[in-house]
Design a protein with these regions (language model features):
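C-terminal catalytic subdomain
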Residues: 77-89
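Short amphipathic alpha-helices in soluble, non-transmembrane regions
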Residues: 17-21, 28-33, 91-102
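Hydrophobic residues positioned within well-ordered beta-strands of beta-sheet architectures
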Residues: 2-4, 65, 79-81
């Protein structure tokens, strides 16, 4: 028997470019012997645009994808793809694009529609005001749109608010995940301001 091992680097699902996918390395090696792995390497590494994975919009940015797992079951290769797509598309759009572009069977698994709240919504403006006040910012801050999942989707109107601050290390979902006491202290002041602003918001 021959065993092939590849070493990678984990990264948050919304920022796969910060990681190093070990599966791609295996596909590259196996592609020298098996055409199917050549195809997979070409699709996911060399030319993702060939199957429609180059989508983007102005408000939420580019689509990101991560090939999270690959197994061989009953002589079939089964791959799981984590996709974070722009808000101007929906799950049916993405499924249709993949079915047209992929040279294989595509099945839709767990899906969440993107969460987006306009930057001029009162909740967003209130939170930004609280943040700027706590941080002593003279220039108003701008919200950002990212591909990360959030429990805020459980609310009729909700947004993720922190806890990552500019310039601070944020090893989310990684080994030795942590938060410094300095970071925690700053967050306490920000959240105090935010809760107070929301409770006394008069519209």
């Amino acid at each position: 028997n021959i065993f092939l091992y590849a070493k990678g680097l984990s990264a948050h699902g919304s920022h796969p470019e910060k990681g190093d996918n070990a599966l791609y390395k295996l596909f590259y090696c196996l592609g020298a012997e098996y055409e199917i792995f050549q195809q997979l390497y070409h699709i996911f590494v060399e030319a993702p645009q060939s199957i429609g994975l180059d989508l983007e919009d102005e408000k939420s940015g580019k689509l990101t994808y991560n090939l999270g797992s690959c197994q061989i079951k009953n002589k079939k290769i089964v791959c799981a793809l984590d996709i974070r797509f722009p808000i101007s598309y929906n799950k049916d759009d993405i499924t249709s694009i993949l079915k047209k572009g992929m040279p294989c069977q595509v099945e839709r698994g767990l899906f969440h529609d993107p969460l987006y709240v306009d930057e001029n919504h009162p909740l967003v403006r209130t939170l930004l005001t609280a943040y700027d006040s706590a941080m002593g910012n003279k220039t108003p801050s701008k919200p950002i749109a990212i591909g990360g999942g959030t429990y805020a989707r459980a609310l009729p109107v909700g947004v993720a608010f922190g806890p990552v601050l500019p310039g601070m290390e944020a090893p989310m979902h990684e080994n030795d995940e942590f938060i410094s006491l300095q970071h925690f202290d700053v967050l306490t002041k920000i959240y105090y301001k935010a809760i107070k602003e929301i409770c006394f918001y008069d519209g």
